[in-house]
Curated annotation (Swiss-Prot):
Entries under PROSITE patterns matching the protein: RIBOSOMAL_L27
Primary gene name: rpmA
Domain of life: Bacteria
GO annotation terms (biological process): translation
Modifications made to the protein after synthesis: The N-terminus is cleaved by ribosomal processing cysteine protease Prp.
Protein name per its UniProtKB record: Large ribosomal subunit protein bL27
Length: 95
């Protein structure tokens, strides 16, 4: 009498696929930090942006990442100029 040993092993756990979703980058908190008519101290950030959506005007500096900041303490003013462009300036109070 001959026995034929035929063993078959089956998976005890079902194979599970992976997903390519489920992650996101942190928001950069871009936009206006000071509104029109608000007081800004020298060195304070007025507008965080990528590119020059808002252009620097009088008493406003532009950082390496295009962030606009006040060079002097004063009142923030936004104004339109040119063809659909916006500029921000800081008006120092009269002494």
């Amino acid at each position: 009498m001959r026995f034929i040993l035929n063993l078959q092993f089956f998976a005890s756990k079902k194979g599970v696929g992976s997903t390519k979703n489920g992650r996101d980058s942190e928001s950069k908190r871009l936009g206006a930090k000071k509104a029109d008519g608000q007081f800004a101290n020298a060195g304070s950030i007025i507008f965080r942006q990528r590119g020059t959506k808002i252009h620097p005007g009088q008493n406003v500096g532009r950082g390496g990442d295009d962030t606009l900041f006040a060079l002097v303490s004063g009142i923030v003013k936004y104004e339109k100029f040119g063809k659909g462009r916006t500029r921000v300036k800081v008006v120092a109070p009269a002494e």
